[in-house]
Structure formats: structure tokens, C-alpha cells
Amino acid sequence: MVIIRLARGGSKKRPFYNIVATDSRNRRDGRFIERVGFYNPVATKGESLRIAQDRLTYWQGVGAQLSPTVQRLVKEAQKAQPAA
């Protein structure tokens, strides 16, 4: 089963997450099929969240499930998008 979830990057105390489409059996930071976006929770300036909506829609269309955290981030991105 394909799942869209966060893969952690960055360094100690400075997390950075890639939003990736991956097989659910793979490790959290392991092999993935496609990078769909990113989330930087410690960003002070600039962009902290970017999601390629077209690719997200594609993966959901072929049956990919969203992790609970990614669902929350997608809602957050959709709320922020009309204001921008």
C-alpha cells in the first residue's frame, strides 16, 4: 500500500521533513517513490510548507493514504493558499 507521510531530515534539534509517497513497509527515512513537498517547522523567514497539489491529487487518485500528520498539513496549506 502506498502512503504519503513525513520523512525526517535536518540535524539534531533542527528538524526538516520531506513529504514523500512511499510503500508503507519501507522505513520512515528509507526509500520513497516521489517527494511531494516539504515541511520546515523551525522556519522563521520564508516558506515553511510547500505541497505539490497536483501530485498529491494524483497519488490519492491511485489509492495512496495520507498519514494523520500529512492530513493536518494539507488542511493547513489549503487554508493558507486562498489568502496568498
Curated annotation (Swiss-Prot):
The protein's name: Small ribosomal subunit protein bS16
Family statement drawn from the similarity comment of this UniProt entry: Belongs to the bacterial ribosomal protein bS16 family.
Pfam families: Ribosomal_S16 (PF00886)
InterPro entries named in the record: Ribosomal_bS16, Ribosomal_bS16_dom_sf
Keywords: Ribonucleoprotein, Ribosomal protein
One cellular component term from this protein's GO annotations in UniProt: cytoplasm
Example GO molecular function: structural constituent of ribosome
Keyword Methyltransferase on entry: no
GO biological process, one term: translation
Domain of life according to the entry: Bacteria
